[in-house]
A protein has these predicted regions:
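N-terminal beta1-alpha1 ligand-phosphate binding loop
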Residues: 1-30
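A general structural signal for well-ordered alpha-helical segments in protein cores
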Residues: 3, 16, 20, 57, ...
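Glycine-rich phosphate/pyrophosphate-binding loop and the adjoining helix
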Residues: 4, 45, 134-181
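Short hydrophobic segments within beta-strands
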Residues: 6-7, 36, 108
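A generic structural motif
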Residues: 28-34, 133-134
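N-terminal beta-loop-helix "entrance" segment that forms/cooperates
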Residues: 38-54
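Helix-loop-strand module that forms the ligand-binding subsite of alpha/beta enzymes
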Residues: 52-132
Length: 181
């Protein structure tokens, strides 16, 4: 099974991207997690889209299409998802053949505060309703005080968080298999 990881942070030392790497490390046998690079996706402009998808957007849409499921790791800015993640979602949600439609998905988030991007995760789930994303409900992975759970190189050093991420990936794999029946 192929899962596409999408980080809502472009920061080099992003805890959310590090959480996706940790998910890849704990994924069950036969499951791969590729992390999308959304850094080159331009700001959404329907005039541009009308002339054809820019190469970075076309590549991202194809990555989504080729994936069996999506795993979002969202940062939280002003009680919501990051602008870069919303922008990538906007590009991926457009016709023709919007690749997000009906896609199994899971969400987790990391923050340096206590709440682990909880509000951003709930907001992403709301956006997902309109897009017909099929989100896993449990477990919820809210990685608060992320600076204490990852080392300076971005490696997850907190075993309970690693186990929670593993459970989320397993749940996503099972959910995806159920939806494909």
């Amino acid at each position: 099974m192929k899962i596409l990881g999408i980080s809502g942070s472009l920061r080099k030392g992003s805890h959310n991207t590090a959480a996706l790497r940790a998910a890849s490390e704990v994924a069950p046998d036969g499951v791969t997690i590729e992390i999308a690079d959304i850094s080159q996706i331009p700001l959404y402009n329907d005039d541009v889209r009308a002339q054809g998808y820019p190469p970075a957007v076309a590549h991202f849409r194809e990555q989504i299409r080729a994936a069996d499921a999506l795993l979002f790791a969202t940062a939280e800015y002003n009680y919501s998802i990051s602008g870069v993640l919303k922008n990538a979602i906007d590009w991926a949600s457009r016709p023709p053949e919007a690749p997000l439609t009906g896609k199994p998905a899971a969400v987790m988030g990391a923050s340096m505060g206590l709440f682990g991007a909880a509000r951003a995760q709930y907001h992403l789930r709301q956006i997902g309703v309109f897009l017909d994303l099929k989100f896993v409900n449990k477990p919820e992975v809210m990685i608060g005080t992320a600076q204490e759970r990852f080392d300076a190189e971005g490696k997850l050093i907190h075993d309970p968080t690693r186990e929670l991420i593993r459970k989320l990936v397993v749940s996503l794999v099972e959910w995806t298999a159920l939806l494909k029946r």
